[in-house]
């Protein structure tokens, strides 16, 4: 029930990066390792977007009402394999992982995060088996000294959200998403 939460600089991918720092003992200036852990977190942070939930070729993902959430198997050098739980629908492919890697990053050679500035331009994404994609380590350099901020407060307003769908078959994609959302709500 806190009214105000004050933190250091935080970002979605930090949950994964923190686990990697703990597990592998990465130091605060091991820029390539930090960039690789951040990339792994970025691939996981939007859940089933990586497993085909918002993929350009969305029809290949199958029954998105039962889509599997992504899993990362991370190596100490920062490379990782992205997969999903067996028996779930969805798709882990070079396409799904690549689209998520580029999602909301701005400049792929200078993706600014609180712990590191990431360069994803030399990352290699390889299909190694069905629903198993290996991602090579990223490059990193020191974090920026300034960063954006976000502040929210309650002031009597309520917000709503819209989802947009683009592409040649956007109407079908939107209908598929709606059907899946209803199925999951009724489950």
What is each stretch, according to the model?
Residues 19-30:
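A glycine- and small-aliphatic-rich helix-loop capping segment at beta-alpha/alpha-beta transitions
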Residues 2, 13, 35, 39, ...:
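General structural feature for long, well-ordered alpha-helical segments within catalytic domains
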Residues 11-12, 50, 87-88, 154-156, ...:
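Short, glycine-/Ser/Thr-/acidic-enriched flexible segments
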């Amino acid at each position: 029930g806190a009214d105000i939460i004050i933190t250091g600089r935080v970002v979605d991918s930090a949950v994964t990066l923190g686990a990697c720092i703990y597990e592998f003992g990465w130091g605060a200036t091991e820029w390539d390792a930090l960039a690789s852990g951040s990339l792994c977190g970025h691939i996981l942070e939007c859940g089933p977007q990586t497993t085909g939930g918002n993929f350009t070729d969305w029809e290949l993902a199958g029954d998105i009402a039962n889509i599997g959430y992504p899993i990362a198997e991370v190596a100490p050098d920062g490379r990782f394999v992205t997969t999903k739980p067996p028996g779930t629908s969805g798709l882990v492919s070079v396409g799904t992982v690549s689209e998520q890697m580029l999602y909301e990053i701005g400049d792929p050679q200078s993706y600014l995060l609180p712990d590191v500035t990431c360069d994803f331009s030399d990352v290699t994404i390889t299909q190694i088996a069905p629903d198993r994609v290996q991602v090579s380590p990223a490059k990193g350099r020191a974090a920026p000294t300034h960063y954006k901020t976000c502040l929210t407060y309650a002031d009597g307003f309520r917000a709503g959200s819209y989802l947009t769908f683009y592409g040649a078959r956007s109407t079908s994609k939107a209908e598929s998403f709606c059907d899946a959302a209803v199925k999951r709500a009724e489950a």
